């Protein structure tokens, strides 16, 4: 088998290479694995260049070039058959290409929806590969990327920025919304793809997947940059685009506070709103580095809303999260009431071997209920509340909602206390 960490690169490269008609016709010709890899890399290079990837081509080819280092795919001329125990001719790479060519790539022939289907397959495959928490990534669930766009409510002229763009999930959802708003204006759609979607990603593998992910949706000139989004050099480049909507899921449990990534995203926005999902420990902090960043954020921006998300949203990881919404470049007013939502039930349930799914089809109705109440700032018992807060307060609905004691039984009380203790231990809260 091929290691998980290599699978995403291989599948990504093949799906790009198959867009080259010459390669798609010739890959089935009997040839050595090393020659097939060489042909694949040449096909990838041609497709990247034809899509206007420019200087990014070299970076992407550096990542895809790792395929040629795989002993099983590119070097060994013979491979051991696990069933017979005999060495047979190595056709593993050709077989993988054929499977993708037959079962996945044909969707691109459907002009209006094909590349989106291909892109969705690709996104889900990346999610499958990087879903292993041992790889150090927490990818945003698809329905949450969609929710972000509904919270931010971009207009057709919005410029969207994600400074931790990963595989470009937020940018893809934003692109889809902006293009829908553009209607039949093809010139505007072109402008959206080329000028209104901005991303930064530091990891070379994630940067590669983000670029290819956008390209598979017809966006070959996306402004996704590789680099440190906290550096002034990169920020100056981003500010030139005058972004108006920030969307991000910063990396968790690194040496940099998640709130710092939000601060730098806001610093790059010309106006508008920033929506981010972060560990609950960040919004609860009343001391330490997260507390300091809470204070800095309120000195320059307005905390518009905080939503407490389902505890198992990032299952199988144990990260409990909250979505925060900031209005840009206006100091948090002394008398401003922040909206707090208790969004703990998104309708998804955990299923064996599949993870969390919208098994009962409740998500769309729940999402509309959440966003309608937020945009109209409705206070609803056991669901939402408005409060004036400072950096000294806990930024979560649970701290301000009235408790319905009729629902509290001894067993519920015991379970809640146990969950609370575990939560504080997991998040390092004293």
Where are these regions (language model features)?
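Long recognition/docking surfaces used for binding and targeting
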Residues: 16, 22-128
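Non-catalytic, well-ordered alpha-helical scaffold segments
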Residues: 5-13, 115-119, 123, 142, ...
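Conserved S-adenosyl-L-methionine
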Residues: 135-255, 260, 267, 279-281
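Non-catalytic accessory regions of SAM-dependent methyltransferases
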Residues: 1-26
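Conserved aromatic-histidine-acidic binding/catalytic patches
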Residues: 2-3, 7, 88, 106-110, ...
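Alpha-helix C-capping/helix-to-loop hinge sites
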Residues: 1, 18, 103-108, 128-132, ...
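Short coil/turn segments at secondary-structure boundaries
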Residues: 3, 8, 27-31, 133-139
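A conserved structural/catalytic subdomain of Rossmann-like adenosyl-cofactor enzymes
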Residues: 226, 238-240, 244-430
């Amino acid at each position: 088998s091929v290691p998980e960490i290599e699978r995403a690169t291989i599948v990504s490269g093949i799906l790009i290479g198959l867009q080259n008609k010459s390669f798609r016709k010739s890959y089935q010709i009997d040839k050595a694995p090393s020659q097939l890899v060489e042909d694949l890399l040449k096909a990838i290079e041609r497709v990247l260049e034809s899509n206007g990837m420019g200087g990014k081509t070299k970076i992407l080819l550096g990542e895809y070039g790792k395929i040629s280092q795989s002993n099983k795919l590119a070097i060994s001329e013979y491979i051991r058959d696990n069933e017979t125990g005999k060495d047979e001719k190595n056709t593993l790479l050709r077989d993988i290409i054929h499977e993708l060519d037959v079962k996945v790539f044909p969707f691109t022939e459907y002009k209006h929806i094909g590349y989106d289907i291909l892109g969705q397959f690709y996104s889900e495959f990346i999610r499958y590969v990087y879903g292993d928490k041992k790889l150090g990534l927490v990818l945003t669930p698809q329905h949450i990327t969609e929710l972000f766009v509904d919270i931010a409510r971009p207009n057709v002229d919005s410029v969207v920025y994600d400074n931790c763009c990963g595989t470009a999930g937020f940018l893809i959802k934003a692109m889809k919304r902006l293009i829908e708003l553009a209607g039949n204006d093809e010139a505007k759609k072109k402008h959206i793809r080329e000028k209104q979607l901005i991303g930064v990603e530091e990891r070379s593998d994630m940067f590669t997947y983000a670029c290819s992910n956008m390209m598979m949706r017809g966006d070959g000139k996306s402004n996704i940059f590789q680099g440190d989004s906290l550096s002034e050099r990169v920020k100056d480049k981003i500010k030139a685009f005058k972004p108006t909507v920030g969307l991000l899921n910063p990396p968790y449990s690194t040496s940099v506070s998640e709130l710092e990534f939000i601060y730098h995203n806001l610093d790059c926005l010309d106006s508008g709103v920033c929506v981010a999902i972060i560990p609950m420990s960040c919004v609860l902090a009343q001391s330490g580095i997260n507390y300091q960043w809470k204070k800095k954020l309120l000195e320059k921006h307005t905390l518009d809303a905080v939503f407490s998300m389902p505890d198992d949203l990032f299952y199988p990881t144990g990260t409990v999260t909250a979505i925060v919404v900031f209005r840009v470049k206006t100091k948090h007013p002394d008398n401003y009431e922040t909206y707090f939502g208790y969004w703990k039930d998104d309708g998804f349930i955990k299923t064996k071997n599949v993870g969390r799914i919208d098994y009962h089809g409740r998500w769309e109705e729940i999402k509309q209920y959440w966003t309608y109440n937020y945009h109209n700032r409705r206070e609803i018992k056991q669901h939402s509340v408005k409060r004036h807060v400072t950096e000294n307060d806990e930024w979560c609905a649970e701290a301000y909602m009235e408790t319905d004691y009729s629902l509290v039984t001894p067993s519920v009380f015991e379970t809640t206390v146990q969950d609370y203790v575990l939560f504080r231990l997991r998040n390092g809260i004293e």
